Amino acid sequence: MELEEELSPADAVLLMSSVPERISDLVYGLDEAKLRYRHGPAFPTLGGLIAHLLESGTRVDALLRRAHLEGLDTADLSGVIDPLQMQELDRPLQEAVDDFARVRRRTVDLLHGWGKNEWERMVSDPHAGEVTLLDICRRVSRHEMAHIVQIRNLTALLPEPEDLGPPTDGQKMPTPAPDIG
């Protein structure tokens, strides 16, 4: 889903603030086997996709805070928002989601205090040229919503658990004779 309208600052903040809860709702109850699910050989695992979303979100939040608090004026947005290397989760899922939610809350609190000048402040990207902090938030919102849709779709495709019965040590299980009578 592509966002067709330009997001206002309030819309971008609202979308960004909703991401941790959306992720949490989608991944609630996923076990290790489900996190290792890969829809095809060219796709990341479900856990890898979740890790990517959490990691890139945390990196973007750090960039926004540094731009505001330290005056950062140059950044590789593509490398921050969508790094080429996708990592697997390296800690328990709920811990990673909770940490991301804490970081995002702090960022959203900061964004709520921004005025027009801060939203329009320019950051130089070697690939995209000059972009405003609002443009960064719009791009992040599109990126995160796209990955949330991917996670939703992948969780819908997860294979159902199947009871294969007791182990058989490689021998055929005797089957009862059919009842013909």
Residue ranges and their predicted role:
Residues 10-17, 50, 54, 94-101, ...:
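Short amphipathic alpha-helical segments with heptad-repeat character
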Residues 1-2, 13-14, 35-80, 122-181:
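Short, contiguous alpha-helical
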Residues 12-15, 20, 86-93, 105, ...:
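Small-residue-biased structural context
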Residues 2-9, 85-93, 126-133:
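A short, mixed-charge helix-start or loop-turn motif at secondary-structure junctions
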Residues 82-121, 135-140, 150:
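Acidic/histidine-rich alpha-helical segments that form the ligand environment
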Residues 11, 16-23, 27-34, 41:
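Long, hydrophobic N-terminal alpha-helical segment
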Residues 20-31, 57-61, 101-115, 145-155:
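Structural signal for well-ordered, non-membrane alpha-helices
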